[in-house]
Amino acid sequence: MEEDRESRVSAKPSGDRVDRLRNLPDCLLFKILLNLPTKDVVKLSVLSRRWRNVWRYVPGLDLECGDFMVREYYDSSEFNALLGFVYRFLGFNSESCLQKFKLTVNWYDDVQLETVHFTEWFNAVVKRKVQHLHILDKTWGRDEVVIPPTVFTCGSLISLNLYDVYLPNREFVSLPSLKVIVLDAVVFDEDFAFEMLVSGCPVLESLSVNKINLNDISESVQVSSQSLLSFSYVADDDDYLEVVIDAPRLHYLKLNDKRTASFIMKNHGSLLKADIDFVFNLGSEYMFDPNYLPTRHIIRDFLVGLSGVKDMIISSSTLQVIYDYSRCEQLPLFRNVSFLRVEFADYRWEMLPIFLESCPNLKSLVLGFSIPPGKEGANILPGPRRFLTSLEYVKIAKPMAAEASEIKLKLVSYFLENSTILKKLTLCLRNFREKEESVIVKKLLTIPRLSPSCQVFVL
């Protein structure tokens, strides 16, 4: 009896939630359901007679072709069911506007899809004034989803998210409402197709580019926008493209590129945040040559372009290039940087103080580490003593290998002994055993602190 009562009590809130949903006005209900995958919206039809056909009225579709894969082998009836479902949805209430159309193209291996239907669907959603269009092709090259011309002149489109699709060249692009573009593994047909797309978006605010394919036609990626606020660029390992960005209102820049030798920023005065993992095509294959002036000039101009940022994330690979450059030329001052995060992939910390000297107003520093266990450490922080006169907060975020504890303590000692106004230092030891952690804490207590108000926290 007690178990039955407990079961009834635990089930009641769920029923109450269903009742509350049933009593919602249609406009609010549809807004909630718009955030669910369409297959889950269809499942709601069993909960209420009112919801039997509710999926037809939701102003958006979020569908995976794979949702119709029932059998372990291909059956044409499944694809016909997919076609029928989408055509019914687009045909019903066809005069209303669509807020979202998200289609993930995934299907049985080695089965070709009739992608002509996708073009008809895209044309239909453009006619219904779609606001957010997300197309993800996950057939890995078996089928090529082509974005039709109508999409390039869709006046209602606000965001465009494309994955592994084909973008043909267009002589005319007009997307007057488009604010967000995400391009992931997108293939462009001809030279200037990418540039044409960006230039046809007069109110574009956010552009994210991840491993796009320019078909070996272009030698550069050109981004010119008077409205752009955020730009993220992740290059393919095989790309050797020059990247040129002219965006006078740009506030945020993310750059992840190991091959590109040149990244040119024009009108960079508004840049506030930067996330940089960029080595100017230098590394194990091409080492920094202090006598090669073109590379030095490119690095100098790039650093000057970053000199106005307030928040910066930088990789140890980029820091290494900056360190090499600093041995032949003076670094520009990063007077506005108040927050800095450095992601280390090795123990080359000797380059850190050089860069910190160029950040005279730095207040918060976070150090992350992704170092394989057993990797040898290096002597750190050689040279004359350098006081850190503005630093208030230090956090060593990601735990390192336990065998690196002595080297880690040297790094902690550096900040405690050289930071004049340090208020808080946080040390993460989550990967350490209790005994090891106890030893480290005891050693921490013996390290002198230049700042009398500094507190050390161990997590």
Swiss-Prot record:
A Pfam family in this protein? F-box
Quote the protein name from its UniProt record.
FBD-associated F-box protein At4g13985
Matching CDD domains, A to Z?
A: F-box_AtFBL13-like
Highest taxon, organism lineage: Eukaryota
**Boundaries of each F-box domain copy?**
18-64
FBD domain boundaries: 375-429
Instruction: Name the Gene3D superfamilies for this protein.
Output: 1.20.1280.50, Ribonuclease Inhibitor (3.80.10.10)
Cross-referenced InterPro entries: F-box-like_dom_sf, F-box_AtFBL13-like, F-box_dom, FBD, FBL13/AtMIF1-like, LRR_dom_sf, LRR_FXL15/At3g58940/PEG3-like
Point out the coiled-coil segments of this chain: none
Q: Which organism is it from?
A: Arabidopsis thaliana (Mouse-ear cress)
